[in-house]
Amino acid sequence: SDSKIGDGCFGLPLDHIGSVSGLGCNRPVQNRPKK
């Protein structure tokens, strides 16, 4: 699930970078995957 979050925002797998995903960039993507 986290891996898809980073994909929609930075285009990179933030699956191991939970801190970066907490910026709120993955929050909207979490509900609706851009991919």
Swiss-Prot record:
Keywords: Disulfide bond, Hypotensive agent, Secreted, Toxin, Vasoactive, Vasodilator. Its main location: secreted. GO terms for cellular component: extracellular region. One of its GO terms (molecular function) is hormone activity. The keyword Disulfide bond applies. It comes from the Eukaryota. Expressed by the venom gland. PROSITE patterns: NATRIURETIC_PEPTIDE. It is found in: Secreted. Negative results: does not activate natriuretic peptide receptor-A (NPR1). Belongs to the natriuretic peptide family. Snake venom natriuretic peptide that exhibits vasoactive and probable hypotensive activity. Is only weakly active on natriuretic peptide receptor-C (NPR3). This is Natriuretic peptide TNP-a. It comes from Oxyuranus scutellatus scutellatus.
